[in-house]
């Protein structure tokens, strides 16, 4: 059965020493070394930035990114969690061969063998939201096929054999769905998917059986938190079949007033029904957050401006910053930016900081393992380099 037909069916569903005065030359070389190190660090920092951080897209002041994930498995091979090492290798080799043969579609893509990366490099990919924590812990015969702009990714041997993922800035659920659906249609021409007429697409996680679709959006909801409305509202979100999690999804800690909202089940719904339902709930959350911001303004504009200004002052001048404190301060500054109280700080910069201040990225920048104290020190350095 063709993919399009199935989607309408059960899925309803990064000097050589010169001659001359040794003293002067040594000083010059030191300056060059320092400059060179700075260039390398800038290059590394740039490598850790991707499209979803650019601060554009609809409702980008509240919705940081939208993501679609489509789980698929190969018929006749056990799910990765049940597969032997030989079976995982078979899946890896098969998909690697397919990706290399399909030059028309994947010629510009990069195939990243995760077992060939250091733990820190894998952690960076997680912090960029490109792979899961599972793939950091279990990288053997796992891979990431990544588009040049890092919008589209295909994860190999994660929870399922294939996880197609699109990640876009702002509220762009439909566009993200179109991206994964297009790749899914293309791959089904060359892969025999595990599919059941009664249930739909078969997946390792029971809640994904049917369409295999997980739709989500990452929201910044500071006003709802500050006004004390967040628990009531998130409880209501849970009652309509949606999950509320931290920035990295299931099991991740909620911090910086960031909340990831996603669907929990797919069976009995079409893909469009899933993402449109999520879209409707997110729009309600956006309206409630805007109303709460007006409430804060009415209670005292100067209080809000002072809050953002104090947060900016600490971020710009503190010598040591813990992760949780930094996230909270970035949230305060972001609220000030979003409400027109703080000038000259693009949302793009604040989005990038959400990733750059994390332990993996900090250690990647310094090319070594850092202690807790060293991370706090480097975190303040990086924040002050980024903020105007």
Where are these regions (language model features)?
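Conserved phosphate/anionic-ligand binding catalytic regions in large, soluble enzymes, centered on
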Residues: 200-217
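Structural signature of FAD isoalloxazine-binding scaffolds in flavoprotein oxidoreductases
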Residues: 220-223, 229
């Amino acid at each position: 059965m063709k993919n399009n037909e199935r989607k309408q069916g059960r899925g309803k569903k990064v000097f050589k020493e010169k001659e001359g005065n040794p003293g002067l030359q040594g000083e010059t070389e030191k300056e060059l070394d320092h400059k060179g190190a700075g260039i390398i660090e800038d290059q590394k920092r740039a490598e850790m930035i991707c499209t979803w951080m650019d601060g554009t897209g609809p409702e980008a002041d509240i919705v940081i990114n939208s993501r679609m994930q489509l789980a698929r498995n190969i018929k006749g091979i056990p799910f990765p969690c049940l597969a032997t090492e030989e079976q995982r290798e078979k899946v890896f080799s098969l998909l690697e061969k397919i990706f290399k043969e399909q030059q028309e579609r994947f010629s510009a893509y990069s195939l990243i063998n995760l077992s060939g990366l250091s733990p820190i490099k894998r952690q960076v990919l997680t912090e960029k939201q490109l792979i899961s924590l599972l793939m950091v812990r279990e990288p053997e015969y796992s891979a990431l096929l990544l588009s040049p702009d890092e919008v589209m990714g295909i994860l190999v041997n994660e929870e399922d054999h294939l996880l197609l993922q699109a990640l876009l800035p702002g509220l762009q659920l439909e566009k993200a769905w179109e991206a994964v659906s297009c790749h899914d249609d293309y791959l089904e021409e060359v892969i025999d998917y595990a599919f059941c007429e009664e249930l739909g697409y078969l997946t390792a996680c029971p809640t994904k059986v049917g369409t295999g679709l997980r739709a989500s959006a990452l929201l910044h909801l500071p006003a709802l938190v500050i006004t004390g409305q967040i628990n009531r509202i998130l409880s209501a979100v849970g009652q309509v079949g949606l999950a509320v999690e931290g920035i990295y999804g299931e099991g991740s800690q909620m911090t910086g007033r960031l909340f990831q909202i996603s669907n929990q089940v797919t069976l009995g719904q079409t893909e469009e029904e899933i993402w449109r339902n999520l879209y409707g709930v997110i729009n309600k959350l956006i309206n409630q957050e805007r109303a709460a911001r007006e409430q804060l303004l009415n209670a005292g504009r100067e209080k809000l401006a002072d809050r953002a200004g104090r947060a900016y002052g600490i971020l710009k001048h503190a010598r040591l910053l813990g992760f949780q404190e930094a996230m909270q301060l970035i949230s305060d500054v972001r609220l000030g930016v979003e409400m027109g109280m703080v000038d000259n700080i693009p949302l793009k910069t604040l989005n990038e900081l959400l990733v750059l201040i994390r332990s993996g990225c900090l250690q990647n920048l310094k090319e070594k393992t850092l202690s807790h104290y060293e991370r706090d020190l480097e975190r303040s350095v990086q924040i002050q380099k980024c903020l105007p």
